Regions:
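Active-site helix of classical SDR
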Residues: 138, 174
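Substrate-binding pocket helix/loop in short-chain dehydrogenase/reductase
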Residues: 113-115, 122-124
Length: 268
C-alpha cells in the first residue's frame, strides 16, 4: 500500500490541522437534506467550513441552510445525473475556487425486492445513485484537488458491501463496488495528495432504516429501533477521518462497529 510522503503529510497538516480547523475549506455533502448528510453538514460547518448542500428535497435543504447560516450553499439536484452534478461543481468552483472535501453520502435502497421481482429500471436506479453518483462526484472534484495540492473523499459504505442480504441485491452490489472505487482513488491519487477513505457506519436511525423496517424482509428489518445509532455519530466520525489521524485509514473502509475506532473518535 502506498503511503503519503513527508511533504504530503505536512500538506495535510496544513490543509486540515491536527486540531481540525476547517476555516476557508469548501466541503460538498451529498444527501444533505436529512440523516447522516444533514448531521455531517452541521458538524463540518461548526468547524468553519463552507458546506455545499446537495440533495433533491428543496424544502429540507432550505431549512438546513437557514440553520447553518451564511456558510451554506444549496443545490437541488439528482446526483445520478452527470450534467446536474457538473453544473453544481462549476458553480461551486466559480464562487470558492476550489473543493477541499467531498462527502459521498447520498444513497438509496428502495424498492426492497428480490431479484425476480424488482424491475430493471428500479435496480438500475439504485446503481445509478449509489455507485455512479459517487463516481461523478469523485471525477468532477479531482481536477480542482490536484490544482490545489490535494483534498479528501469520504465515502459512505455499508456492512451490506460484504454480506449478501435478501432483497438487497442492488444495494449490496452498489456498496461493494463503491468500496473498490474508494481503493482505486487511493491507488491512483494518494501520491498526489488526495485522500480516500470509506466509512461503514453500521445501522443508523434514518429514513432508510424506516423503509427497511417497513419491508419486514431479512434480519436487519427485525432490529429494534434502539439498536440504531444517532446520525450525529457517523458525522463525528467523518469529521475525524477528514483530519490528520484519518491518514492511518487511507484507501480503506473503516467500521463504526470497531470498538477501538469508536474510542479513538470519542464515541464511547
Amino acid at each position: 500500500m502506498l503511503s503519503l510522503s513527508s511533504t504530503q503529510i505536512v500538506l495535510v497538516r496544513k490543509q486540515f490541522g491536527q486540531k481540525m480547523s476547517l476555516n476557508g475549506k469548501t466541503v460538498i455533502v451529498t444527501g444533505a437534506s436529512r440523516g447522516i448528510g444533514a448531521a455531517t453538514a452541521e458538524e463540518f460547518a461548526r468547524k468553519g467550513a463552507t458546506v455545499v448542500l446537495v440533495a433533491q428535497d428543496e424544502r429540507k435543504l432550505s431549512q438546513l441552510s437557514k440553520k447553518i447560516g451564511s456558510t451554506a450553499r444549496v443545490h437541488v439536484l439528482n446526483i445520478a445525473k452527470f450534467k446536474q452534478m457538473e453544473k453544481m461543481f462549476a458553480t461551486t468552483l466559480r464562487e470558492f475556487g476550489k473543493v477541499d472535501i467531498v462527502i459521498n453520502n447520498a444513497g438509496t435502497i428502495s424498492p426492497i425486492k428480490k431479484l425476480m421481482d424488482i424491475s430493471i429500471d428500479d435496480w438500475n436506479h439504485v446503481i445509478d445513485v449509489n455507485l455512479k453518483g459517487v463516481f461523478y462526484g469523485i471525477k468532477l472534484a479531482i481536477p480542482s484537488m490536484l490544482q490545489n495540492g490535494g483534498g479528501t473523499f469520504l465515502t459512505l459504505s455499508s456492512g451490506a458491501a460484504h454480506n449478501p442480504l435478501e432483497a438487497w441485491s442492488h444495494y449490496c452490489t452498489s456498496k461493494a463496488a463503491v468500496n473498490m472505487l474508494v481503493r482505486c482513488v487511493d491507488l491512483e491519487y494518494r501520491q498526489l495528495g488526495i485522500r480516500s477513505i470509506g466509512l461503514s457506519p453500521g445501522t443508523v436511525a434514518t429514513n432508510m432504516q424506516r423503509e427497511i423496517k417497513k419491508s419486514q424482509v431479512n434480519q436487519v428489518s427485525k432490529l429494534e429501533w434502539s439498536a440504531h445509532i444517532d446520525p450525529k455519530w457517523p458525522a463525528k466520525a467523518l469529521l475525524w477521518l477528514a483530519s490528520y489521524p484519518g491518514n492511518e485509514y487511507l484507501g480503506k473502509e473503516v467500521s463504526l462497529r470497531d470498538e477501538a475506532l469508536r474510542r479513538r473518535i470519542g464515541m464511547t
